């Protein structure tokens, strides 16, 4: 089981059942209840027949993988759920299946009073696999757990074999509320490698009721290979060294990379912001490395690879800095105008990530940032269409159209062009293509790439505008120490961003240091990432930067909160200690090097969650996930391909 996730757009995958049908099924009187109530056949997407979801269950060092597969099924058609667990001591792994829509705020639980058995079918890859069956009612949901009802061997006396067997779990002796059943968990609690296939989960009135077989489902049309895109940030050796260029393009051809998003820069790049520079009134300049680009692009075109100019920075989203990215757009257009057709860029792609700006945490400022961001992209698209034959696109996160847990509002909602909707939908309406940073280390499940990408693809199919690339992450960053100032309550934080700290609202870096914000539910704490081994000069700069943040956005710099600064600190420490993205928190006094004044603060180590990257996935497992993603996403007309972030880490994974 799991706690409820952020509410999302409630769309049933592949149109299998409408929400009205799901509710009607639940409201049917007991006399009309079918002998067999199907919960999950795994045939049609991630959401099941009663509105629930499934997802892998894991805690490091255990690794779990789930996939809906068509090669091992009950009967002649359909899908089953393949569950693979490498169970290690100290972790846990398996799969959970909910009987309610955990993405709907007030979703009803499942009433199974009229049923005597939970039923599901299982077969092993080798036989002998061991696991424990757990069930949960509504009371177990807040505990993020389920009640063990017995090892699988209790219900299968001969154990798991390589043939399909039905598991029947009697409900009469289970001490749960059968009027409000929440889910099923299969917990692989024996150390070792296990792979089983699960199918046709449901409830039966009697043990003799036959579980129907899947008759037919519409499978996606499978292709031998699918087009892909790839980000490339460190481009110099690829465009300037002939042998490396050949090697790079050979790799692209082998991996079916048809579109490259490659970092460009201008001759006068000193004018570009280091992270905190204010508005730059005039930014003009020619593209750097023109001769190298001409040679490289011509070579790429000869092997069927498109090249798009890539640039981006969070501060570019803000209106006062639009002249910088627009200068890049103009420079690429000018370069194309003076180049032969085979030497021209095929497009321009911006990766700005405006949600990294400090002001994003204030809803009013967030909407301003998003309006500015949309205005930038609309103008960039206009220039590209008016002055070239290129395409224009931008990267977005997958979660702007998900709802905030506290407000119920879309995370990226904004009024623009007479419509109030998520910025992701606005961008799909106006641009040639969109790269969705759909960063998860699994395709399947409630928290997988398919679930997070399908509402955007459905919208794009309906609107028939932008093509969508589904991004996948293969990089990982090492743990980074972050120093925080003891922060302010949300109201005071937002007031300061509009007042004394207004100059920080539109920054993602302060004095060159990348910022991080930790929200403990009551207070917002701003910090900076430290270099791995700061020099004495950097240490002085760190102290001055922390003092600046403390005076503007810290408890010790706010007259009304200053006396409670250490209380704020005591409140945040246990909360950041329980957050999986952080470890080793401890209090730290911040000293201003200018006047030696002290500010309350703390430090913690930032961790990249394994679930957002395939960096820890083996190459064969990565191939399987990519194949699954491409087959599932290809159902959508707007799907343009997977987009791989980024070249060096993906190549290292391929060559493991």
Show which residues each predicted segment covers.
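Catalytic domains of carbohydrate-active enzymes, especially glycoside hydrolases
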Residues: 243-268, 343-344, 433
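Aromatic-lined carbohydrate-recognition surfaces of secreted/lumenal glycan-active proteins
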Residues: 233, 306-317, 373-419, 465-477
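Substrate-binding cleft of secreted/luminal carbohydrate-active enzymes
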Residues: 438-445, 459-656
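Aromatic-lined substrate-binding rim segments of carbohydrate-active enzymes
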Residues: 262, 266-313, 361-394, 450
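Beta-rich carbohydrate-recognition modules and glycan-binding surfaces
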Residues: 26-218
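Aromatic- and acid-rich polysaccharide-binding/catalytic face
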Residues: 345-346, 352-356, 415-449
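Active-site groove signature of glycoside hydrolases
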Residues: 261-266, 332-369
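Boundary/entry segment of secreted carbohydrate-active catalytic domains
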Residues: 40-44, 209-252, 263, 645
């Amino acid at each position: 089981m799991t706690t409820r996730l952020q509410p999302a757009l409630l769309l049933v995958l592949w149109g299998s059942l409408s929400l009205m049908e799901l509710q009607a099924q639940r409201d049917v009187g007991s006399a009309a209840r079918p002998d067999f109530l199907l919960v999950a056949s795994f045939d049609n997407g991630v959401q099941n027949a009663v509105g629930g979801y499934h997802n892998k269950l894991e805690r490091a060092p255990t690794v779990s993988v789930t996939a809906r597969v068509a090669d091992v099924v009950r009967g002649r058609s359909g899908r089953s759920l393949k569950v693979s667990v490498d169970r290690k001591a100290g972790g846990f792994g398996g799969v959970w299946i909910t009987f309610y829509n955990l993405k709907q705020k007030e979703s009803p639980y499942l009433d199974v009073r009229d049923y005597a058995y939970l039923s599901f079918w299982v077969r092993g890859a080798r036989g002998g696999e061991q696991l424990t069956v757990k069930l949960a009612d509504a009371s177990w949901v807040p505990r993020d757990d389920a009640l063990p009802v017995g090892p699988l061997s209790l219900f299968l006396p001969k154990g798991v074999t390589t043939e399909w067997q039905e598991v029947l779990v009697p409900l009469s002796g289970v001490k749960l509320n059968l009027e409000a059943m929440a889910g099923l968990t299969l917990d692989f609690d024996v150390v070792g490698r296990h792979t089983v296939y699960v199918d046709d989960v449901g409830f039966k009135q009697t043990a003799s009721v036959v579980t129907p077989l899947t008759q037919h489902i519409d499978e996606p049309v499978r292709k031998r290979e699918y087009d892909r895109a790839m980000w490339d940030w460190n481009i110099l050796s690829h465009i300037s060294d002939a042998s490396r260029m050949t090697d790079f393009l050979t790799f692209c051809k082998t991996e079916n990379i048809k579109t490259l998003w490659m970092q460009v820069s201008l001759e006068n790049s000193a004018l570009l912001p280091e992270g905190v520079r204010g508005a730059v009134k005039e930014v003009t300049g020619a593209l750097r490395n023109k001769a190298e680009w001409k040679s490289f692009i011509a070579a790429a075109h000869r092997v069927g690879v498109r090249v798009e100019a890539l640039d981006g920075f969070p501060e570019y989203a803000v209106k006062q800095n639009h002249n910088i990215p627009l200068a890049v757009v103009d420079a690429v257009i000018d370069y194309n105008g003076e180049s032969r057709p085979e030497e021209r860029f095929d497009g321009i792609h911006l990766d700005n990530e405006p949600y990294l700006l400090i002001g994003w945490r204030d809803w009013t400022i967030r909407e301003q940032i998003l309006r500015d961001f949309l205005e930038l992209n609309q103008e960039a698209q206009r220039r590209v269409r008016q002055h070239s034959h290129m395409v224009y696109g931008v990267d977005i996160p997958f979660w702007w159209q998900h709802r905030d847990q506290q407000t119920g509002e879309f995370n990226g909602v904004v009024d623009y062009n007479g419509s109030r909707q998520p910025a992701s939908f606005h961008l799909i309406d106006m641009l040639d293509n969109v790269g969705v940073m759909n960063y998860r280390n699994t395709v399947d499940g409630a928290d997988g790439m398919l679930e997070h990408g399908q509402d955007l693809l459905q919208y794009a199919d309906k609107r028939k505008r932008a093509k969508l690339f589904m991004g996948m992450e293969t990089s990982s960053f090492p743990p980074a120490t972050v120093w925080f100032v003891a922060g302010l309550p949300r109201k005071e934080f937002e007031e300061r961003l509009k007042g004394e700290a207004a100059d920080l609202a539109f920054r993602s870096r302060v004095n060159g240091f990348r910022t991080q914000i930790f929200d403990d539910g009551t207070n917002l704490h701003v910090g900076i990432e430290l270099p791995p081994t700061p020099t004495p000069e950097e240490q002085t700069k760190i102290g001055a930067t922390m003092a600046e943040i403390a005076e503007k956005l810290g408890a010790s710099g706010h007259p009304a909160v200053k006396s409670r600064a250490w209380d704020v600190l005591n409140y945040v420490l246990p909360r950041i200690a329980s957050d999986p993205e952080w470890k080793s928190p401890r209090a730290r006094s911040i000293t201003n090097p200018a006047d030696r004044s002290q500010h309350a603060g703390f430090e913690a180590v930032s961790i990249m969650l394994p679930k957002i990257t395939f960096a820890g996935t083996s190459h064969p497992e990565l191939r399987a996930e990519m194949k699954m993603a491409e087959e599932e996403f290809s159902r959508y007309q707007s799907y343009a391909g997977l987009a791989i972030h980024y070249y060096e880490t993906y190549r290292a994974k391929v060559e493991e």
